[in-house]
């Protein structure tokens, strides 16, 4: 196996066993003795594929053996296999007939980064966000029972995703309906237990065997007539298992817990899965894997190698780097540290996005004021509300797509009480190769309808810094939404001064056409304006809208064009139209933004072009409307 990033194979490896196992049916025709060799080949194939395309990396390497075992033991796709999040699903895709399409992974018109129902019958449930798998698999298990079907339902969930409340809601419900289903905990961080080894593997085989299960069920029937005796027996079994395994919590929730077992020991996993396949009721298997297994750098640094960029040809000349500014997330991270130094009331909260949201430096400088709540967006928002009640100034750093999961808390716990909580909303707009499940397409629409909410859209790095200060000093809930990637390299002021709330600024004076920009399309708008002599306005605030400026522009221009990287429906442009209608002002409007579709994965520039939000698309749309109006 390669030991450095540059040693990842650039040519497809020779894989005679994998060539015969490109579908689960082919896999099941292999001898069990061949499967460990198959695992080696699949791991090499995954290294090669992701090296060519880039993408999620470490999680897939860690579940090679588990993926093989699941498809070997269960009759997929008839048996329903649900992967949580989907970061670990690349080996699954390779083994389910998509090997020859893997080089199109995450590319325009190629296969998706996550399981998609429309892509394969083996992808039984579309994912991207975490902690949904148990609920989905439970729904499938109940449906199978109602249809008198014997098909199995299996959910594979990671230890990180198991921190979310939704997962425990499903675990609790499954025992209530006594669902025949299997949950597999893929523990790749050892956050639950380190008790893995020969004794644990041996115990798992015993506890999952039909003999043990039949004895257990027989005893239950007899002792159920003697409630006191049954409760003593149940507790005795639970405590005996608890001395060797960490499953007491799951047993208390009504699940038959097995494990932990070594997730890279194929014979043990296959034997255990075969034993558990026909057991009735909720079954829980705990497997321990190593993220990045088989690639030393990823084993050492699983966070850094969570995803990788594609390998470039060794002889490819270095392309000249385009001038660009810092990442917007880095600007936020620096502001957070600066404001924390100036205001000791500030606290930082994130739902498991420390690195992505650039909170590393803040967490190191102010550990007592930093709170990573894990994958628990609802809790993160209400935690912030509680802190704000006591005089703290919480900053919730969260991706736009994940804030959707805490919308009730945003309204009920923060906004209704008019609490001082600042939402730093990263990854707003289109995010590229991860596709529609990760796009921040709706935040302006779902934020601007909330009374008292301050909503801001920076056009560059300096505007972001000023808006963060504005939101921090605002008396009430505030949101600043900014995109993934780098800014246009605008000079950044070192101060912490706020903006005047609700005031936009004219960046270029033109005539006839006014381009009202909400966010980072300002550079494209200025470029287009040079071709048509348009006025360009950096609106800055979606809420409160600069109504005086909108009226002024409507009175002096023949066409108003709104620009935003948000859904057109209910977005910033809609706010302009609603205001003009409320004032009985009739004015031609053109709203440019994200259409009423899910924009599929591609490079960000390709996605913007598809939506007509690049300079060429904006210019074409505006000129077409001008021609229609005779301008």
From Swiss-Prot:
Give the reaction(s) catalysed.
D-glyceraldehyde 3-phosphate + pyruvate + H(+) = 1-deoxy-D-xylulose 5-phosphate + CO2
Organism the protein comes from: Pseudomonas putida (strain W619)
What this protein is called in its record is 1-deoxy-D-xylulose-5-phosphate synthase
Family annotation (InterPro entries)? Dxylulose-5-P_synthase, THDP-binding, Transketo_C/PFOR_II, Transketolase-like_Pyr-bd, Transketolase_BS, Transketolase_C
Name the lineage. Answer: Bacteria, Pseudomonadati, Pseudomonadota, Gammaproteobacteria, Pseudomonadales
* Pfam families linked: DXP_synthase_N (PF13292), Transket_pyr (PF02779), Transketolase_C (PF02780)
Cofactor: binding details: Binds 1 Mg(2+) ion per subunit.
Q: What does this protein do?
A: Catalyzes the acyloin condensation reaction between C atoms 2 and 3 of pyruvate and glyceraldehyde 3-phosphate to yield 1-deoxy-D-xylulose-5-phosphate (DXP).
Gene Ontology CC annotation, any one: cytosol
């Amino acid at each position: 196996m390669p030991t450095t990033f540059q040693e990842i194979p650039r040519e497809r490896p020779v894989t005679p066993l994998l060539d015969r196992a490109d579908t689960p049916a082919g896999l099941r025709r292999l001898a069990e003795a061949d499967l460990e060799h198959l695992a080696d080949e699949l791991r090499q194939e995954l290294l090669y594929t992701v090296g060519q395309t880039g993408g999620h990396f470490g999680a897939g390497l860690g579940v090679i053996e588990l993926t093989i075992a699941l498809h070997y033991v269960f009759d997929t796709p008839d048996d329903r296999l649900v992967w949580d999040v989907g970061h670990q699903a690349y080996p699954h895709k390779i083994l389910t007939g998509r090997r020859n399409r893997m080089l199109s992974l995450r590319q325009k018109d190629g296969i998706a980064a996550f399981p998609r129902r429309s892509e394969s019958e083996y992808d039984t449930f579309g994912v991207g966000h975490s902690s949904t798998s148990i609920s989905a698999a439970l729904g499938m298990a109940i449906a199978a029972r109602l249809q008198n079907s014997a098909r199995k339902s299996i959910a594979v969930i990671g230890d990180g995703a198991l921190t979310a409340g939704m997962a425990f809601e499903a675990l609790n419900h499954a025992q209530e309906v006594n669902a025949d289903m299997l949950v597999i905990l893929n523990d790749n961080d050892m956050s639950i237990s380190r008790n893995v080894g020969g004794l644990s593997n041996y115990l798992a085989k015993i506890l999952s065997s039909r003999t043990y299960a039949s004895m257990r069920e027989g005893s239950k029937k007899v002792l159920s007539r003697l409630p006191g005796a049954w409760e003593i027996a149940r507790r005795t079994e639970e405590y005996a298992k608890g001395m060797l395994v960490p499953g007491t919590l799951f047993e208390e929730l009504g699940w038959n817990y097995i494990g932990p077992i070594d997730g890279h020991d194929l014979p043990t996993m296959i034997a255990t899965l075969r034993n558990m396949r026909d057991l009735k009721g909720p079954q829980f298997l705990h497997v321990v894997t190593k993220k990045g297994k088989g690639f030393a750098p990823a084993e050492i640094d699983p966070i850094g190698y969570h995803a990788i960029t594609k390998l470039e040809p060794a002889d490819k000349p270095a392309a000249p780097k385009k001038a660009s500014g810092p990442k917007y997330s880095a600007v936020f991270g620096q502001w957070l540290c600066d404001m924390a130094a100036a205001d000791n009331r500030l606290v930082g909260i994130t739902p498991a996005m420390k690195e992505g949201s650039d909170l590393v430096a803040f967490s190191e400088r102010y550990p007592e004021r930093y709170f990573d709540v894990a994958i628990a967006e609802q809790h993160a928002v209400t935690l912030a509300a509680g802190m704000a009640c006591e005089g703290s100034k919480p900053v919730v750093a969260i991706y736009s797509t994940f804030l959707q999961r805490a919308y009730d808390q945003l309204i009920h716990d923060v906004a209704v009480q008019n609490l001082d909580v600042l939402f730093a909303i990263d990854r707003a707009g289109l995010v590229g190769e991860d596709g529609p499940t990760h796009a921040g397409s709706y935040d302006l629409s779902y934020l601007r309808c909330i009374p008292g909410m301050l909503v801001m859209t920076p056009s560059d790095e300096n505007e972001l810094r000023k808006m963060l200060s504005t939101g921090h000093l605002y008396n009430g809930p505030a949101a600043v939404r900014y995109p993934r990637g780098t800014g246009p390299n605008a000079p950044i002021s070192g101060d912490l001064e706020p903006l005047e709330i609700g005031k936009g600024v004219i960046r270029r004076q033109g005539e006839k056409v006014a381009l009202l920009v909400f966010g980072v399309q300002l550079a494209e708008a200025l470029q287009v304006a040079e071709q048509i002599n348009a006025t360009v306005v950096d609106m800055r605030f979606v809420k409160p809208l600069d109504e005086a400026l909108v009226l002024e522009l409507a009175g002096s221009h023949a066409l108003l064009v709104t620009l935003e990287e948000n859904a057109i429906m209910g977005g910033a442009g809609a706010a302009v139209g609603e205001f003009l209608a409320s004032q009985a002002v009739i004015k031609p409007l053109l709203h440019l933004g994200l259409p009423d579709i899910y924009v599929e994965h591609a490079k960000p520039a390709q996605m913007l072009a598809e939506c007509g939000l690049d300079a060429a698309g904006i210019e074409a749309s505006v000129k077409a409307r001008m021609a229609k109006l005779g301008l």
